[in-house]
Amino acid sequence: MSKVKKNEDTLSEVLVDVNRVTKVVKGGRRFAFSAYVVVGDKAGRVGAGHGKAKEVNEARGKAKQAAKKRMMKVPLYQNRTIHHDVVGKSGAAKVILRRAKAGTGVIAGGSMRAIFDSLGVHDIVAKSIGSTNVYAMISATFDALNKLASPKSIAMRRDKKVNEISIKSSDIQVNE
């Protein structure tokens, strides 16, 4: 099996957070910078990474490399939204992701918006509950994205055909 070389030119990069951190040593304080970056190809692949260095640009570069290593493929519905609603948690942060109709747009706050823009999602509604810490929210969002499954993958897991597991609202009969 040959590895497919990733085209790094098409990756979009969003700097989500930069902090100045301090290490106290015997001779005083040593300052450094920590950066958190989200990268994606706007076609269903996204990753996030953290980097720390003496300079902001070095920290950003390390974070970008870490994000590229942690990239994941997310199944998208019609290349614009997610297949189903999902909840993700990380510590005290909880994130609810809901699929949306075409034309809705990205309704999400803060760091979640950066993930969806890098992922290539055009229609989604996201709500964060609990902690609004950037790291916790991104972790919770990735937890939710990991739980997503396409109808094709669900059908394969259940040894069924896709049309056997998909339920259309017109197929539901109501007894009156």
Swiss-Prot record:
Entry keyword annotation includes rRNA-binding: yes
GO molecular function: rRNA binding; structural constituent of ribosome
Top-level division of the source organism's lineage: Bacteria
Residues of the signal peptide: none
InterPro entries noted in UniProt: Ribosomal_Su5_D2-typ_SF, Ribosomal_uS5, Ribosomal_uS5_bac-type, Ribosomal_uS5_C, Ribosomal_uS5_N, Ribosomal_uS5_N_CS, Ribsml_uS5_D2-typ_fold_subgr
A GO cellular component entry from the record: small ribosomal subunit
SUPFAM superfamilies the UniProt entry points to: dsRNA-binding domain-like, Ribosomal protein S5 domain 2-like
Pfam families from the UniProt entry: Ribosomal_S5, Ribosomal_S5_C
PANTHER family in UniProt: MITOCHONDRIAL RIBOSOMAL PROTEIN S5
Domain notes from UniProt: The N-terminal domain interacts with the head of the 30S subunit; the C-terminal domain interacts with the body and contacts protein S4. The interaction surface between S4 and S5 is involved in control of translational fidelity.
Protein name: Small ribosomal subunit protein uS5
Native species: Rickettsia akari (strain Hartford)
